[in-house]
Structure formats: C-alpha cells, structure tokens
C-alpha cells in the first residue's frame, strides 16, 4: 500500500486534515500524519463570513499524529501533503521539517500543498520559479521567494500541486489523484 506523508500541527485546519486522511484511505493509500511530535493534535475550523476581511476560527477536532518530523524517512513515502490553517505559521520554523521538504524535492517526489501550507514550501526554498496558488493572504510569502501566484482552483507545476482553501478540495484532489495515477 503506497504511503503519503500529511503535514500539520496544532492550529491546523480540521476539515483539510480529516478530508485528506479519509480521501487517501478511500483510494487505498496509507496516510501518515506528521507533526513536531507524535501525539493528539488540536485542530481548528476556519470559515468565511460576509463582512469579514479574513477568515474566522473555531475550535475543531483532534487528530493523532503518527510520526514526528525528525523521524520521517523520505524514501518511505510516494508524496507529501502540506495542510493549511495556522499550523504553518510556526511549522515553517521547524528545521527538521524544512529539510524533509527539501529532501522530497531532491528525490523528485510529489509535493501537494493547500492554503497556508505554501508557507512551508516558501520557507523550505523549493518553489522559486514555480507557478502556485494559495490562500490569498499567503500570496506575498510565495512571491517573495520567487514563485508566481495565480488565482485558480488547483495548479500543477511539475511535481507541485497547490490549491487556495478547502473550498477547492474537488479540483485539488482530482489533480492529486491524476498525478498519482500517472495520468
């Protein structure tokens, strides 16, 4: 059974995390949730409300992290998925995680990112020259490191696939599974 590494942490987007785990299980993949340490994570739910300039946040569900970043062996996985929410705000300072992302890139493996997950790719320095999409308030993060931001439901550039938010899950996961099937 192929394995995918799913990266999140406390403050990660609950809907993105639970959907990812279940979606990969449905397709016969083994999802492995990675975080700074293997323990129960505290996820949050984000929503978009009329009249607000940004999203609102509520307490979400919990999710068990299967493995700590410093225990990840890139060769055990076919791909990595970086989730959004607030977790990337602090995870982008985690050196073992950033080195793991660079190793996925060097190995030519698939790298998928949604929402604020693009902050991790920006910090790892692996999206220079790439065309990506992300949550609109992450735009400057990706442009500052030399990526091109576009407004689309899902963007594939080489081995990278990105999407803005959980609202774009249908397009994002269609593209992910198209890539993983070799299409």
Predicted regions and their residues:
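Catalytic nucleophile serine of serine hydrolases
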Residues: 115
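Extended, subdomain-level signal for the structured scaffold at the beginning of enzyme domains
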Residues: 1-107, 111, 120-131, 139-183
């Amino acid at each position: 059974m192929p394995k995918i590494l799913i990266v999140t942490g406390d403050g990660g987007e609950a809907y993105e995390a639970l959907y990812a785990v279940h979606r990969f299980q449905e397709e016969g993949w083994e999802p492995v949730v990675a975080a700074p340490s293997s323990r129960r994570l505290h996820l949050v739910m984000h929503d978009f409300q009329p009249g607000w300039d940004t999203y609102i946040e509520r307490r979400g569900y919990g999710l068990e992290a299967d493995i700590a970043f410093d225990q990840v062996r890139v060769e055990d996985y076919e791909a990595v998925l970086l989730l959004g929410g607030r977790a990337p705000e602090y995870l982008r300072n985690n050196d073992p995680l950033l080195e793991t992302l660079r190793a996925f890139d060097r190995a030519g493996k698939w790298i998928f990112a949604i929402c604020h997950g693009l902050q991790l790719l920006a910090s790892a320095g692996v999206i220079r020259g790439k065309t990506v999409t992300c949550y609109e308030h992450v735009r400057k993060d990706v442009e500052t490191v030399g990526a091109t931001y576009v407004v689309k439901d899902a963007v594939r550039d080489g081995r990278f696939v990105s999407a803005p938010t959980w609202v774009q899950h249908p397009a994002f996961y269609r593209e992910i599974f198209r890539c993983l099937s070799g299409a």
